[in-house]
Amino acid sequence: EEFDVKKLGINKRIKSEIKKLKKYHVYEDISSFSNICDKKTDVIIFAISGLAGLDLIHKLCKIGKTIGMANKECIISIGQNLTKLAKKNCSIIVPLDSEHNSIYHLLNNNHGPFESITITASGGPFRKLPLKSFNNISVKQALSHPIWKMGKKISIDSATMVNKALEIIEAKYLFNLKDSQIDAIIHPQALIHAMVNYKNGVTTALLNKPDMRIPISSLFFKFNDYANKTKELNLLEYSKLEFHAINTKRYPAIKLGKEVMKIGGLAPNAFNYLNEILVSYFLKGVIKFSDITALNEINLEKIFSKNTNIMSPNLMDIKNINKWIDKNLYLRN
């Protein structure tokens, strides 16, 4: 109601919601979501989680709209084919993840040729937990993120740092980067979301409090033209800003994610799809927290010992490899 939305697509329709949404055109079937996009549509926010919206985002990139992208999994799965498709059809993808939204605005300020990009991670709930305790991490512990309030899946991804590994891959595809041009560091205060390092030795950074209203509002307004309700950042409230290298023994998903990025092709999709499955098993108590990344690596080796890695996969290639994973997933006892 606040933004006078005319059409709305939802994945699950609940009776109580229907009563509230009578004045809107509501679409509940994902396959019909494209009905919300007509000539009068200016901006589409794509917030379907995981790979459920893979077909839809492929269609949306063909219709020349501005897309606020709150789904990294689809970008990672289709890779540069998606960004090329958007560019070909004059669609604009604006990432809504705080890190990639920061990069988007920093690069649009056009300070000249850049050398590399750094995104930050808070370190999640286990930044200081002894490594010997990782086998005993409970679901409740893993869901307790120190900074962000999120759903279960993304909270687990943040705890394992799979989320950051996926964001590294996403940045490569969104901004057409070489593998050597993107990395991540730990920044516990989560005030700096990304930094762009230029060839002249200058580094620019975007700082704001961790609040998703900031990247979302920037989708609808010029970056400095909208005053939202986020409290102004006062650096004097912080005694220090910390930065640490990522320990891959603590966060093996970062190392695995970088290896997957270098391999390319179907590997990033397989890494992501395996993670979705393995996180669901952890939430059900079937596997341990430390198994999430370990089993991902084991299954990746199995997948590409049995299947050819297609370097420029289309939607059918992705669906086929995901079906193979469903049938042949390895879970150790």
Name each region found by the language model.
Residues 1-333:
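Catalytic, metal-anchored helix/loop core of enzyme active sites in primary metabolism
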